[in-house]
């Protein structure tokens, strides 16, 4: 058994592998076994892996594009390790990036998962959207980070360099105990992509396990590798999966109120996209997401019952009680440090 397995999920990402895999190997090979799980790529990814990296990388070939969530589930079933580190192919790692993560996990057995600090490849003094310095949720399920709220991304001045318990750690660079991963049920493959790591981390927190950001470790992220922000499918998956996650994970006494408010807020967002941004694609995507959630919600009733049966605490501090929309748009609080 390996102590740590870095698993990079790839689909037609040969350019990212060519650019960033050498650095992963350079700065990780002494502390981890590196795997690339390929989601049935049709580019030259497998040719590259089997020729240039055949001695350094273990390749897992999947039979089709299973997406991010189920792709990782399929791949990790074939990996025997104490810790998994799920790593995007568009991550540039840094010297000694693994040491703080490993030492922290070894020293804190009640921590199920952690992440490094995530900075932008293109603006290297800025946090990166997908996880920054650790993730939180507001009362209504809107995610935000230390260093990023909605589209406001902060400059990294060391203001969030303390280890912090969080609600969720980024799926771009997620270190997790294998036992916790499978005990919690893994990533929800039905999500395909988007919100899946938040859903998993919330389930871990419900079970009484901790999730942390360890900013002594930092990496650089390109971002937008699954779907570009302008793609309506990204909007669809984000809304559908976020609603599904809320249905699965909300406490019983909050479920009705939060889901009712989200009905109002989602349609408000849709019309804002249409009227102010003239974005027909995203407008339709929100309506499609609401319909999809309505139709498949019944498929998650058993999931909800099982998750609630594992609940160790009614309230999780990193799921904040305020409305992020109110704080951001009405109060003008656009930095994490300004939030109540």
Regions inferred by a protein language model and the residue ranges of each:
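Short, acidic, metal-binding catalytic loop of nucleotide-sugar glycosyltransferases
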Residues: 22-31
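Short aromatic/hydrophobic "clamp" motif used to bind/position activated sugar donors
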Residues: 84
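Conserved donor NDP-sugar-binding/catalytic core segment of glycosyltransferases
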Residues: 92-142
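A short, conserved alpha-helix in the catalytic core of glycosyltransferases
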Residues: 161-218
């Amino acid at each position: 058994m390996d102590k740590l397995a870095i698993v990079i999920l790839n689909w037609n990402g040969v350019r990212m592998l060519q650019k960033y895999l050498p650095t992963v190997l350079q700065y990780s090979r002494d502390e981890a076994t590196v795997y690339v799980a390929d989601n049935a790529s049709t580019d030259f990814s497998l040719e590259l892996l089997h020729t240039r990296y055949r001695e350094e990388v273990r390749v897992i070939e999947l039979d089709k594009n299973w997406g991010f969530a189920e792709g990782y589930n399929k791949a990790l079933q074939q990996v025997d390790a104490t810790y998994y580190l799920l790593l995007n192919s568009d991550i540039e790692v840094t010297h000694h990036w693994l040491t703080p993560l490993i030492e922290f996990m070894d020293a804190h057995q009640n921590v199920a998962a952690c992440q490094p600090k995530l900075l932008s490849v293109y603006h290297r003094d800025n946090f990166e959207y997908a996880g920054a310095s650790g993730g939180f949720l507001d009362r209504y399920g809107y995610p935000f980070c230390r260093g990023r709220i909605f589209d406001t991304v902060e400059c990294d001045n060391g203001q969030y360099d303390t280890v912090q318990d969080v609600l969720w750690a980024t799926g771009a660079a997620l270190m997790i105990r294998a036992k916790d991963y499978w005990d919690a049920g893994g990533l929800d493959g039905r999500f395909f992509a988007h919100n899946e790591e938040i859903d998993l981390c919330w389930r871990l927190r419900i079970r009484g396990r901790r999730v942390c950001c360890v900013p002594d470790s930092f990496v650089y992220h390109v971002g937008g590798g699954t779907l570009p922000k302008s793609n309506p499918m990204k909007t669809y998956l984000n809304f559908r999966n976020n609603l599904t996650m809320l249905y699965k994970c909300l406490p019983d006494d909050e479920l009705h109120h939060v889901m009712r408010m989200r009905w109002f807020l989602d349609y408000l967002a849709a019309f804002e996209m249409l009227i102010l941004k003239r974005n027909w694609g995203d407008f339709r995507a929100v309506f499609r997401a609401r319909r999809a959630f309505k139709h498949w919600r019944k498929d998650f009733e058993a999931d909800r019952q099982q998750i609630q049966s594992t609940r160790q605490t009614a309230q999780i501090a990193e799921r904040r009680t305020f409305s992020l929309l109110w704080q951001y748009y009405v109060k003008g609080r656009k930095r994490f440090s300004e939030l109540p």
